[in-house]
Regions:
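N-terminal and secondary-structure boundary signal
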Residues: 1-299
């Protein structure tokens, strides 16, 4: 049985997000730092959020190559919500092409066997249905070592090379509980763009998560919070682990969107170690009171 939190979500989670507009950044589509939408299906949530963000055309120019980083790590079906929602993925791919993208690629360095994860998650079929290509990321030769200036622990990493060759980089995590890091959202999802994840786990995981954001932050972060795993993450055990929140978050600030997601899962952002470290490193804004935030309920 899946618990539904849609009725009280606005007051108890998204309602905690401040709706603040500074004089230097007037409110209105295209002027928001973060958009939070609730009460809809994954596609309608996404479309309204992007409308408030100013449209995908803000991020993609004609002829550009786009790479998408969903969560497609787990060999489980969509109804288990361990991976990014396939309907959302298809809508994003289509939107990228409408904005003028020449090519749209998606990939993940999966935790379970990659072909089964791609197929059974529904993500690969969704990307293809939208006209994009799902790329394999299971072989070390697909990765190139880079330096990460300013990092404290993760000073080097082997990064997926096609990401480096792309013009636009969009991060599409699913909001979940995680046994090792309490939450997994946008910052944690980037572990799927590197080859040696074991180094992170052996060398201060939270610091490595923050360090990697110094290399290349996504141009846009779209957080799937429609069906949310609130326990037994990141893979989950059954649908009993899930809460139907029917929400979606969008921001170009990877720390801000994680801070908002942390609140949705009932945590103060500063209590999540990698978020606090990222704030201290200047990765983004953890204080949501300093941002222009648009909250929308689709009734």
């Amino acid at each position: 049985m899946i618990y539904s939190a849609a009725g009280g979500l606005y007051a108890t989670t998204l309602g905690k997000l401040p709706a603040f507009a500074s004089p230097s950044s007037p409110a209105g589509p295209g002027n928001y730092d973060l958009v939070a939408v609730r009460r809809g299906d994954p596609v309608s949530l996404y479309k309204r959020a992007m409308e408030e963000m100013g449209g995908m055309e803000r991020y993609i120019k004609s002829g550009q190559t786009v790479i998408l980083k969903p969560n497609a790590s787990w060999d489980v079906p969509p109804e288990r919500a361990a991976n990014t929602n396939p309907d959302l993925m298809k809508a994003i791919v289509e939107d990228c092409f409408k904005a003028g993208a020449r090519q749209v690629f998606a990939f993940d360095h999966t935790c379970d066997q990659w072909e089964k994860s791609y197929d059974n998650s529904g993500v690969a079929n969704a990307v293809r249905a939208g006209g994009g290509q799902m790329l394999p990321a299971n072989v070390e030769r697909y990765y190139k070592e880079v330096d990460i200036p300013g990092a404290k622990r993760l000073t080097k990493a082997k990064v997926y090379e096609r990401l480096m060759d792309s013009d636009v980089y969009i991060n599409i995590p699913v909001l979940k509980h995680h046994a090792s890091t309490t939450i997994t959202i946008a910052m944690k999802n980037l572990m799927g763009v590197v080859w040696d994840r074991r180094f992170w786990h052996r060398n201060d995981l939270h610091q490595c998560i923050a360090d990697f954001c110094l290399y290349k932050k996504p141009d846009l972060n779209i957080v799937d919070a429609y069906l949310v795993m609130t326990q037994n993450g990141p893979r989950g055990r059954s649908e009993a682990d899930l809460t139907r929140m029917q929400s979606l978050l969008v921001s170009s600030d990877i720390l801000a969107v994680d801070a908002a997601g942390a609140l949705m899962l009932g945590h103060q952002p500063e209590d999540i170690t990698h978020l606090r470290i990222a704030a201290e490193m200047g990765i983004g804004q953890i204080d949501l009171e300093q941002l222009n935030i648009k909250r929308v309920a689709l009734d």
